[in-house]
């Protein structure tokens, strides 16, 4: 039997159908899925991978209500966003919860590549952080981030700092902003953006850096971090290396936690 993979987004489910499956079979499967789970109102088919720096995904309507607007809940938070216009991964739910559990009372937190603000909001809602600053380049994602901050009653705790991370970093540097925690759920890009993180770090800053690697090449991710730290004249201590999920055959999302000394 051909395998299907799913991503559940509350009222919407995205199915990755096997190549060549007939449309009638897809519709039949989608209707069966909605019947077995009443919370699912819409079934979409994934037609392309996340692409570009804005990490947009392509989907096609299969059955149910004709919408790509999602209402999704996790970790005591609620999120609204458009599947095709913004990036969101429900598979990172446990990662978000784990990072929130590492935040100390009074921490100032900076989240890069924040999307519709899931990391920022989960951290703000589930920790005693003083303030969470949320950066994203995608304008559409920032609109939803603003909406989500309001939906979760966090206007006093989460601040949007939208725009290109390089320009935002320069602006924050001029304001002499330094952070206790920097979270970097990076897209699959060649550039690490660690230079920008180091510019906003101080002695004692904890950085949670995400990268992608073949299963047998995780050490290369660590070496890249050490190399970037040396370039920025920062001494670091690696605290933890974690396999944070598979994104393909033998290819992993990796999280490296490290401390600025």
Residue ranges and their predicted role:
Residues 1-261:
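SAM-dependent transferase fold signal centered on methyltransferase-like domains
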């Amino acid at each position: 039997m051909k395998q299907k993979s799913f991503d559940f987004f509350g009222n919407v489910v995205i199915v990755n159908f096997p190549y060549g499956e007939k449309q009638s079979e897809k519709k039949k499967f989608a209707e069966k899925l909605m019947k077995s789970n009443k919370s699912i109102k819409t079934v979409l088919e994934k037609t392309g991978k996340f692409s570009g720096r804005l990490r947009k995904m392509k989907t096609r309507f299969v059955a149910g209500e004709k919408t790509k607007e999602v209402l999704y809940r996790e970790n005591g938070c609620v999120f609204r966003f458009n599947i095709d216009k913004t990036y969101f991964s429900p598979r990172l739910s446990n990662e978000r919860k784990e990072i929130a559990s590492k935040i100390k009372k009074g921490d100032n937190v900076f989240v890069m590549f924040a999307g519709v603000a899931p990391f920022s909001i989960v951290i703000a809602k589930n920790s005693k952080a003083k303030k969470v600053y949320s950066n994203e380049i995608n304008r559409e994602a920032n609109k939803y981030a603003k909406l989500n901050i309001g939906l979760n009653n966090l206007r006093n705790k989460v601040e949007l700092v939208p725009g290109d991370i390089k320009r935002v970093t320069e602006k924050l540097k001029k304001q002499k902003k330094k952070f206790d925690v920097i979270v970097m759920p990076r897209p699959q890009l060649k550039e690490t953006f660690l230079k920008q993180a180091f510019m906003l770090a101080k002695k004692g800053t904890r950085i949670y850096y995400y990268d992608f690697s073949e299963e047998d090449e995780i050490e290369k991710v660590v070496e890249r971090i050490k190399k970037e730290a040396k370039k920025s004249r920062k001494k670091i201590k690696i605290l933890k290396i974690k396999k944070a999920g598979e994104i393909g055959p033998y290819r992993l999302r990796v999280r490296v936690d490290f401390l600025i000394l």
